[in-house]
Regions:
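Non-heme di-metal
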Residues: 1-250
């Protein structure tokens, strides 16, 4: 489920072998999926409706399945795909979600997971799917499509919530935007500012993404476009949400 690279370390130009680049791309994706599985499991614990509990647990299982598929792609190329849900950026994202859990804020949880994290996952996975060789590309593309279904699943609930209280919903959306989207944007900034991400197995892979026809800027741009599209589907004014995005780290 989540953005493919959050790769912060020394940004000196690297000479990564292609397999090592894919190892790190898969590691970020696998970690994001495990975070999503943890989030859905936590969400199930605050749901009162048995159907909502079952739905959240089903989503958790799907995300764990995605993580397993990314690990399998690593084995296909002869590498062990590491993950680290305690990695700097992923830990911050998890903590933001857990604050919504502590407040029993079901809508806040949906906003963080389904709107913010899934938007980055859909867009970044789709981009990786276009350039990934063989089964890697097909796996990323397939999981991107599955993640998009998660967004669609949440839209009806969130639209109804916004219709009940537009101002309250939009204020919550903006508060979570500053908290969560700032971290997501930091993962794909041009310059590395906060040290190693604690997921990549070596130095920062971002400069090496060009070797597999990707770039952090491309992934960031696509992810933010998907996010804006999702906010538009919720009914938030485009002129407002565009200002939100321009405030994010670059």
């Amino acid at each position: 489920m989540e953005p493919v690279v959050g790769l912060q370390s020394s940004c000196a130009v690297s000479s990564f072998p292609t397999i090592e680049i894919w190892q790190d791309v898969l590691a970020q994706a696998m970690t994001g999926e495990l975070i999503a599985a943890m989030n859905y499991t936590s969400l199930s614990e605050i749901c009162d409706d048995p159907e909502e509990v079952a739905d959240a647990l089903e989503h958790a299982g799907i995300e764990r399945g995605h993580a397993a598929r990314f690990a399998a792609e690593g084995r296909r190329i002869g590498v062990a795909v590491q993950n680290n849900v305690e990695g700097k950026h992923w830990k911050k994202l998890r903590e933001a979600f857990l604050r919504c859990i502590a407040a029993r804020d079901f809508i806040g949880c949906l906003i963080v997971q389904e709107i913010m994290l899934e938007s980055f996952a859909v867009a970044s996975y789709a981009r990786v799917g276009r350039v990934g060789p063989g089964t890697q590309g097909r796996t990323f593309a397939a999981i991107a499509a599955e993640e998009e279904e998660h967004i669609d699943h949440a839209m009806e609930i969130l639209r109804a919530e916004r219709a009940r209280d537009v101002q309250g919903f939009d204020e919550k959306m903006y508060r979570l935007h500053l908290e969560v989207m700032t971290t997501l944007a930091e993962m794909l900034t041009k310059e590395c500012r906060t040290g190693h991400c604690e997921v990549c197995h070596g130095t920062c892979v971002k400069p090496a993404l060009f070797d597999i026809s990707l770039s952090a800027a491309e992934l960031r741009g696509a992810s933010l476009q998907q996010y804006l599209k999702t906010l538009d589907m919720l009914g938030l004014p485009g002129e407002v949400t565009l200002q939100w995005v321009t405030q994010l780290p670059v």
